């Protein structure tokens, strides 16, 4: 949805909205960005897929984007992930892609990929947002994760 809001002009219901739905930057975790005939979920959107498929609406001016995928994601194949990054770059956009070998859809959840994977994704997302001026300060992902795990363990007791 975030990618569609950023890339698909027909998503805005009214062209004169005072508040745009276009984000300043995109941090995408396993996005389904190909709704075309060969893409995920096409049968549900056959009448309007061209209007909502980010892969088919790549153009210059898309916000800086970082994408995280598992190589075994069954919703979006790696070939599509790489083609998306290539087309984004060719259009003059920033698109950083991180593919995690051996992992499937939703790998970044702490319950699926574990704490190390969870923190790796957050650290890379944080660095991306710092690089583009949306975050400042020192990265505290590990400390934050440790405190959250401690809180959850305390609640469970």
What annotation goes with each model-predicted range?
Residues 32-35, 71-75, 102-106:
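Solvent-exposed loop/turn segments at secondary-structure junctions
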Residues 61, 66-69, 73:
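Short beta-strand/loop motif that positions the catalytic acidic residue
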Residues 22-25, 62-65, 91-96:
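Loop/turn elements at helix/coil->beta-strand transitions in domains of secreted/extracellular proteins
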Residues 74-83:
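Conserved alpha/beta-hydrolase "acid-adjacent" motif
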Residues 1-60, 141-153:
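Primarily recognizes the serine-hydrolase "nucleophile elbow" in alpha/beta-hydrolase
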Residues 82-157:
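C-terminal catalytic histidine-bearing segment of alpha/beta-hydrolase fold enzymes
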């Amino acid at each position: 949805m975030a990618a569609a809001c950023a890339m698909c002009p027909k998503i805005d219901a009214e062209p004169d909205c005072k508040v745009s739905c276009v984000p300043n930057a995109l941090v995408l975790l396993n996005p389904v960005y190909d709704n075309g005939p060969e893409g995920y979920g096409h049968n549900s959107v056959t009448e309007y897929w061209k209007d909502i498929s980010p892969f088919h609406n790549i153009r210059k001016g898309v916000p800086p984007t970082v994408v995280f995928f598992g190589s075994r994601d069954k919703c979006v194949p790696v070939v599509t992930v790489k083609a998306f990054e290539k087309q984004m770059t060719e259009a003059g956009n920033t698109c950083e892609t991180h593919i995690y070998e051996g992992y499937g859809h939703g790998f970044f959840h702490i319950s699926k990929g574990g704490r190390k994977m969870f923190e790796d994704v957050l650290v890379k997302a944080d660095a991306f947002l710092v690089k583009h001026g949306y975050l400042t300060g020192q990265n505290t992902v590990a400390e934050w994760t440790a405190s959250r795990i401690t809180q959850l363990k305390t609640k469970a007791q």
